[in-house]
Amino acid sequence: MVQIEQHVWGMTPEGEAIILYTMRNDKGAEVKISNFGAAIVSVTMPDREGRMADVVLGYKHPEGYFFDGAASGKSVGRCANRIAFGRMTVEGKESALEVNNGPNHLHGGTKNFANRIWESRVETNRVVMSLLSEDGDQNYPGELNVEAAFDFDDENSLEITYLARTDKTTVVNLTNHVYFNLAGEGSGSVLDHQLRLNSSQVLEMNDKQIPTGRLLDAAGTPQDFREFRPFRPGIDSEFNHIRDFKGYDHPFVIDGWKPNILGEVGCLREQTSGRCVTVLSSQPSVMIYTGNWLAGGCPETKSGGRYNDYDGVAIECQNYPDAVNHPEFPSPLLRPGETYCQKIVFRFGTFA
């Protein structure tokens, strides 16, 4: 049975309370979640010997989460990832969005959902957070009601359910930006972690980190993760701009994806600790980001230091980047009367 505790962790500059929820199961594993950014703050899991460690990145103080560039552990939206040149057309009306990442719009803008207080409550063994995004918020059309529900169980499985409804057709693509280091937060590079993905194709990217619209076969390339492989050997490859991006920062297409069906995305594992996390999602793609720009941009960490590049890997289940400008991609549009519902599941365990 999961026990949930809560306390006031801090305050925003506007005087809003930052609540920290601790979800602890019968095995002693625990997950901490904050209502600032609907964020995963820590995940404490056993290694193969039963020794506990926090396996996600995060900051020592709640203020560290204010507008951090890494969006560590936070729920981003309205639209995760990039929209080319901050331009989109919805039902014939063009919107100019904030350009906040090179020439592109990223994660819904500076004041995106990751940088706001969410209303929050406990429902039995889950924590539910909600947010109202007004019509025109960050120049997106339509009023959007958003909910993020976090469920944790005695089998060390963390499930996130994102729901959204709108009164005008709009763009929605929600994900969580948690960074994993299965050796333990603050233990250094994740480049020797091994990843397996249920993906035989990747999106071809241009040098501005926008999909060209083409799908590339991953077989025989540094982006072929159909079998477990570490990140390090491919980190300097010229394939699909890996070197240009300083590492992996790419969307992988999930094989056999069907709308509204939860399917396996893949598994991340770390040999020394024996920890692993299996990821499931109802989304059509997953962004693998090896923390290429963590150095210098993060506040004081939970372990009291500073992160270096590659100290964590984000596994971001989501729709294709820039999908609103690619009719051949799965549609990111949400219409009145429809309910956006997407799930992400992180199943933690160990291997021999």
Stretches with model-predicted labels:
Residues 1-352:
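An exposed, glycine/acidic-rich loop-and-rim segment of catalytic or binding clefts
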